[in-house]
Amino acid sequence: MKTRDNPLKMQVEKNVVDIVTIAGTRPEIIKLADLVQLLDGQGNHALIYTGQHYSDNMKSIFFDELKIKPDYDLRCDTSDVATLKENMLKYLREIKPPHILVYGDTNSSLAGALAAKEVGSTLVHIEAGLRCFDLSVPEERARIKIDSISDYLFPPTELARTFLSYEEIDKNVTVTGNLVVDVCKRLAKVADEYGRHYDLPDKYLLLTMHRQENVDERERLEMLRKHLSGIEHKIVFPIHPRTKNNLSRYGITLPPNVIAIEPAGYLEFLYLLKNCQLVMTDSGGVQEEAIVLRRPCVTLRHVSERWETLLLKANVLFPLHRRDPLSDVIEMMLDAKIERNPYGENVAGRMLHLIKEITQ
């Protein structure tokens, strides 16, 4: 993909790339949007998009809506860490950036962190310190590894910093808040014009589900159907293609109270989220967005890295194998009073200041 007349190559020739940000998935792109715009304004920054979540539709939806463009698109279309790293190294060895930023716990982030160490760049890990304390979760293993090799760590909360200290990671650790706050609040203000085309009930619950352990097994999908059929409320479900294909493959039909719609762009999704009564999800990012927009959340997993949302009683865990009715938990959470957002304000601006201090 050639973007901005391939400015990355132009910057390489001028030898002015000081900071490279690496991203490859929807959550990373969303959360990094405001920070990337600020870094681009400094004139010494390049964004590498790995294509871990690759599709022309996703790129156009997210990059156009979020007003950012990758300087280089690797089009890897894979989640294999070794392949992602090798593709990055082709360009990082040429650029030799002094600093590399990675976000969160994706395979793109892990590959970027490993590549940074290989080329000798200073590694900054944004969203450091999240822990679910279950090593069977691939993201848990990734974030532990990334944190262990990072030169600077930006945990979003004091609790995340505490988790790092348990692992004896105390040097160059700064609590920054969560970048999702800036993007979510800014775009929620304009989301209505992107959601007007939906024909939705006045009151509805929102459902998102994409994790492999939930959507790839017939038994889990049958459990989902059973739980959803016991809920009296209408449920709007922007259905992930993987989930849709597996439902069809197993011959499982959604109950009548579920309104399945096409996958939503980010602004469309914010419209659905801000107008719902409650969201059910297995997404870490949606747990964060829900509390920012003061929407109760039920997380369809047995663990969560977003402890703050659980401690504030804005979120509750409900793994699909539970025998008690999901409907009972829904009714309880509909009365949840969400009084504050634990993730800070003006996070991108604060983070830019910290990055400037590191790179000077």
Language-model regions, residue ranges each:
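Conserved nucleotide-sugar phosphate-binding/catalytic loop shared by glycosyltransferases and other
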Residues: N44-T83
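Active-site and donor-binding regions of nucleotide-sugar-utilizing enzymes
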Residues: V20-A23, E28-L38, F62, D73-E168
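A nucleotide-sugar donor-handling region in carbohydrate enzymes
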Residues: K2-L8, Q52-N57, R75-C76, I146-V215
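A donor-sugar binding/catalytic signature common to diverse glycosyltransferases
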Residues: V102-Y103, L110, L114, H125-I126, ...
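Donor-nucleotide binding loops and adjacent catalytic segments primarily
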Residues: S55, K59-F62, A191-N275
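N-terminal subdomain of nucleotide-sugar transferases
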Residues: K2-G51
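Leloir-type glycosyltransferase catalytic cores
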Residues: F63, L159, A314-Q360
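Short acidic-hydrophobic, aromatic-tinged amphipathic segments that line or gate anion-handling sites
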Residues: D73-C76, P155, T174-T176, I259-E262, ...
